[in-house]
């Protein structure tokens, strides 16, 4: 059954896909994340995500957590550079409970001072964990290198100093400025009719007043490649290289998504993995990644290896990039790349929580939301020349930033 999009009486958008599953998923997705913090608010978006569950006007922190767990459900949240998600998975008979709970959390969280201080300790431990995990830390530091001086480069967790200075007043101000009407979407995939879900959402979300004041984002411009080598107490070298790429609205995003998957995506058969790990055993881990934001994107290659293998690995990476820039995919290669990506997306879409989050994400950025079939058709329409064009525009080592931990 296709998804449906409905506007509630207060203008809030709801996207829902009806299923016959015994398990359902419902979420509140906000188009606000790390890049929307001021220079003195580092880590605030993530801290809001942590502390919004710490009690409401009518629920203690325990009652918030136990509300869904008592019926076998789960309550979760996540923060990224541009979005914050609050969502729950639950037996489909518990839709009223799920919708009411998320509305209560979202509109009536109290952020008690005592709970804020406790959660600061938790986040500081999280920051220390990442500092001790170079394979995680390098991703954050690489974004800071590429987006130097721009909010997209800021660490999602913040710093120890910035977290310690977060205040309840700052939290309330951030929510008021960023959790605005056109920045919020309700998303659902589950066993309930659209008509009944709309009634529930009108009951618990429809009467709330939500600010609709626009909030401009600082655009990212004037990228300059940088190379940085840092010495750390580690046994392996960790390397990242890459540059800005296409934003979420650009047509070139789809052929580049296909190209990235072929080059170093999920499969063990990716070109980078076959060349560096499988054939030569020079690295334990190698991958490429592509993330699209609202006004830019990021392409990166990551690998970890013994220090003596670092330069040979770099040479092999550049050779693979040369091949893919100078040789158009043949008919069989292109068909295989499409088949692999389509299959991966189909498997991911089988997880209905992922489908709910994907629908909500699309609703945040697009007026019209593609069906799964329409997304697949976009991939199938990609030509070998389009792949070659995006390869030559993005996969150029002269515009790469490079970060090395050794």
Model feature map: region roles:
Residues 14-16, 28, 186, 241, ...:
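Generic preference for hydrophobic
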Residues 11, 18-68, 142, 251-263, ...:
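Active/ligand-binding-proximal structured segments within catalytic/core domains
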Residues 7, 63-213, 229, 246, ...:
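Charge-rich, well-structured scaffold segments of protease-associated domains
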Residues 15, 25-29, 52, 76-78, ...:
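Short, conserved beta-strand segments within well-ordered enzyme catalytic domains
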Residues 1-10:
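Short, Gly/Pro- and small/polar-rich lid/capping loops
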Residues 46, 50, 150, 238:
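Histidine-centered active-site/metal-ligand motif
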Residues 18-20, 27-29, 212-270:
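His/Glu-based metal-binding/catalytic segments typifying zinc-dependent metallopeptidases
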């Amino acid at each position: 059954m296709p998804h449906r999009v409905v506007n509630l009486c207060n203008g809030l958008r709801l996207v829902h896909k009806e299923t016959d599953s015994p398990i359902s998923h419902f979420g509140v997705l906000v188009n606000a994340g790390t890049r929307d913090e001021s220079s003195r608010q580092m880590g605030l978006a993530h801290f809001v995500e942590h502390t919004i569950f710490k009690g409401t006007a009518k629920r203690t922190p325990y009652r918030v957590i136990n509300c869904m767990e008592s019926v076998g459900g789960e309550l979760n949240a996540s923060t990224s550079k541009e979005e914050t998600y609050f969502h729950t998975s639950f037996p489909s008979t518990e839709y009223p409970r799920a919708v009411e709970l998320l509305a209560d959390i979202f509109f009536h969280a109290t952020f008690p001072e005592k709970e804020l201080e406790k959660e600061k300790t938790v986040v500081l431990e999280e920051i220390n964990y990442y500092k001790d995990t170079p394979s995680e830390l390098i991703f954050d530091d690489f974004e800071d290198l590429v987006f130097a001086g721009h909010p997209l480069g800021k660490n999602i967790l913040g710093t120890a100093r910035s977290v310690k200075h977060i205040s309840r007043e700052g939290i309330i101000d951030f929510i008021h400025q960023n959790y605005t009407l056109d920045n919020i979407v309700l998303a659902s995939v589950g066993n309930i009719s659209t008509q009944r879900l709309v009634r529930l959402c009108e009951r618990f979300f429809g009467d709330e007043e939500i600010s609709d004041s626009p909030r401009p984002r600082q655009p990212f411009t004037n990228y300059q490649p940088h190379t940085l080598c840092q010495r750390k107490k580690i046994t392996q070298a960790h390397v990242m290289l890459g540059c800005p790429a296409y934003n979420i609205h650009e047509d070139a995003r789809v052929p580049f998504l296909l190209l990235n998957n072929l080059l170093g995506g999920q499969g063990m058969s990716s070109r980078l993995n076959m060349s560096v790990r499988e054939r030569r055993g020079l690295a334990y881990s190698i991958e490429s990644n592509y993330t699209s934001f609202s006004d830019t994107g990021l392409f990166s290659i990551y690998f970890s290896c013994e220090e003596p293998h670092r330069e040979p690995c770099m040479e092999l990476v550049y050779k693979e990039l040369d091949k893919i820039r100078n040789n158009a995919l043949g008919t069989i290669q292109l068909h295989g790349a499409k088949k692999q990506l389509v299959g991966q997306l189909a498997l991911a879409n089988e997880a209905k929580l992922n489908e709910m989050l994907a629908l909500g994400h699309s609703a945040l950025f697009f007026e019209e939301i593609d069906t799964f079939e329409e997304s697949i058709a976009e991939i199938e329409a990609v030509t070998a020349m389009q792949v070659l064009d995006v390869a030559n525009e993005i996969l150029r080592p002269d515009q790469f930033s490079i970060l090395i931990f050794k």
